[in-house]
Structure formats: structure tokens, C-alpha cells
């Protein structure tokens, strides 16, 4: 919920670290409010030795507070991946990519793929995905194609999408 269009990975990571340092990830008391999260996100972040401001602190604080409330109720325990993704996507700000990210990183599941613009473009260049497919509109179809491709080359989807993302990101930085 911290990342997305217009937020660089490094800034996202710094914001995540800030929330973790403040106890957001450990809290279970329900004491963390939208206002508290906003104040944490408004403080300048250290990114590669530079102070930067986080984009969209108000919107993200609202979304994180709502998500925090949902997780406090343990609403998602014991759900299968398909049901869990649907439940996650019912929360404002969570689309198929973020839901897949949560499922992958919280459950260690390889039943999902994290398809972002980097993976989309790379797979289109390799002719794995059709050129006319777009995110988020075609996410589920793209994910199925990616999972089939991953199985065909005998590479875990979690490894394949991470490697593609990393390599495309590095190539763009050059």
C-alpha cells in the first residue's frame, strides 16, 4: 500500500522501514490511527543519504489505517488464495498486484505472480504476453500466462518475476 505509480522503490522501502521502526507492523492494540500514520509519513525520509518527502501521505495513511483495521480482525485467516485475493481487493487501494504481493510475501505462495509494468513489458518483448494486454485490466489472464510459462521452464514464479523486475529495473537505470 506504500508503493505504486509515482513512488520509487527506494522511497517505498524507506517509508516501510519508518513504519516498521514506529511499531506499525508489531502493533495489535488498535491504537494506531490514520493521523498517527500520516504524521509518520510526513516526516522526511532518508533515501541514499538525501532527505525526501513521501508522496501521497494523506491517501496512504487512510488506506493503511483501513487495512490495519481489517487485519486486526484476522478476517483473512484460513482462506484459500483465490478467496484471500478477492478479500484483499475489497480494501481501497489494493488491486490484483498488491493482493498478489501480500499473498506471496505473507504466505510464501507460488500460486500467484506479481505482474507489474516491468514484468509486463519484458514478457511482451519475449512474446509471452500479447502486445495489446494491459494492466490492471488483463491482470488475471497475464498472471495465468506467466504461471504457465514459469511451469514450462521449471522456475518458481516468485523467482522469475523477481529476477525480471530486478533486471529490467537495473537496465533502465543505465
Predicted region positions:
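Residues in flexible loops and secondary-structure boundaries
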Residues: 5, 10, 27, 121-123, ...
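Extended cationic-aromatic binding surfaces that line active-site or macromolecule-binding grooves
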Residues: 1-22
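Alpha-helical ds-nucleic-acid-binding substructure associated with the helix-hairpin-helix region
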Residues: 20-92
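Structural motif
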Residues: 6-10, 51-59, 151-155
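Short secondary-structure capping/turn micro-motifs that flank functional sites
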Residues: 18-19, 35-36, 139-140, 166
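C-terminal accessory module of base-excision DNA glycosylases/AP lyases that mediates lesion recognition
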Residues: 58-70, 77-85, 90-174
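Bulky hydrophobic/aromatic packing residues
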Residues: 2, 6, 56, 99-101
